[in-house]
């Protein structure tokens, strides 16, 4: 993003210094090596606990001004374990992450690679040929797609815009898709082109450290359209307006509970009290559970 930063460098450098890591340091920044030249080479020992504050993420602001969401270290570690568990990730896997890392959705999917010791590839660009070429060159085994990107890939194949035989895709084992409802027709179409692919999707929000608190696993492709069941290490319930659990088939508010629930809305005790109750995160999303225990929103 050097070019983009250069365009606004004068504006954003007021009352702050800009540092650069890598070769060809631009004139608007100071090189990080110069900053650290006289610093000790040993790593400072900083004792951390699971309960220590780790990160602040911001909500999308769909219901008002974006809220600052505080998470601790246990929350971030749980996100990594959830991704590793749901995708069966090992150090041999290569995960392709396309969405930007400034939100929890992309970053927590990426964390599965960090805890597994596997490689993650970050791709800027969503054209079908970019995605397929990257999967081929980097030998990606897990690819996270949004619904429009998956549709674009299938359309490009159908139109002849891309030719699958040009790419080495045999190692690609899992197509993860999410961030919005997934049409069953899309997955049926995908399986015709990629019959050996496993498929999964999930549900989450920034307050639950991103995706995974509800998960539709690789063995439940017949339930496409649902968001799934409680994810690894999570509990879920659906309640009425009085907080009582509803019966299966009835509509109520989806609530989740687990190690990934936020600590609070930063410096907003009123909003925190409205959202966190007895350890449960009230998501604000209406949902129902079918006869097999699968949840739809």
Specify the residue positions occupied by each region the protein language model found.
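Conserved S/T- and glycine-rich ATP-binding loop of Class I adenylate-forming
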Residues: 53, 59-62, 95, 101, ...
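Conserved AMP-binding/adenylation subdomain of ANL enzymes
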Residues: 77-94, 102-142, 156-157
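Gly/Ser/Thr-rich phosphate-binding loop
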Residues: 115, 140-145, 154-222, 235
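Structural core segment of the AMP-binding/adenylate-forming
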Residues: 1-34
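Conserved pre-ATP/AMP-binding loop-to-beta segment of ANL
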Residues: 20, 25-27, 37-58, 65, ...
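Short beta-strand->loop structural element characteristic of the AMP-binding/adenylate-forming
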Residues: 2-3, 67-70, 97, 119-126, ...
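Adenylate-forming
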Residues: 35-36, 59, 76, 228, ...
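Conserved ATP-binding/catalytic segment of the ANL
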Residues: 244-249, 253-297
């Amino acid at each position: 993003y050097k070019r983009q930063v250069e365009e606004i460098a004068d504006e954003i450098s007021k009352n702050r210094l800009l540092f650069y890591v890598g070769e060809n340091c631009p004139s608007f920044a100071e090189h990080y090596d110069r900053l650290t030249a006289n610093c000790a080479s040993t790593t400072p020992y900083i004792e951390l606990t699971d309960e220590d504050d780790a990160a602040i993420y911001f909500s999308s602001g769909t219901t008002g001004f974006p809220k600052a969401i505080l998470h601790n270290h246990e929350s971030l570690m749980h996100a990594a374990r959830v991704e590793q568990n749901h995708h069966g990730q090992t150090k041999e896997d290569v995960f392709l992450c396309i969405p930007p890392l400034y939100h929890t959705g992309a970053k927590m999917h990426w964390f599965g690679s960090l805890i597994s010791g596997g490689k993650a590839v970050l791709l800027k660009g969503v054209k079908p040929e970019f995605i397929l070429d990257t999967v081929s060159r980097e030998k990606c085994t897990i690819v996270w797609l949004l619904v429009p990107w998956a549709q674009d890939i299938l359309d490009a194949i159908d139109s002849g815009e891309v030719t699958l035989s040009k790419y080495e895709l045999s190692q690609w084992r899992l197509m993860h898709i999410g961030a919005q409802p997934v049409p069953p027709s899309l997955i049926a179409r995908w399986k015709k082109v990629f019959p050996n692919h496993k498929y999964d999707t999930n549900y989450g929000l920034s307050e639950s450290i991103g995706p995974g608190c509800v998960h539709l696993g690789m063995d439940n492709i017949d339930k496409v359209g649902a968001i799934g069941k409680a994810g690894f290490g999570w509990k879920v319930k659906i309640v009425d307006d009085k907080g009582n659990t509803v019966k299966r088939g009835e509509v109520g508010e989806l609530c989740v509970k687990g190690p990934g629930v936020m600590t609070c809305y930063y410096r907003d005790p009123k909003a925190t009290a409205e959202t966190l109750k007895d350890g449960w995160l009230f998501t604000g999303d209406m949902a129902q559970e079918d006869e097999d225990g699968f949840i739809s929103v």
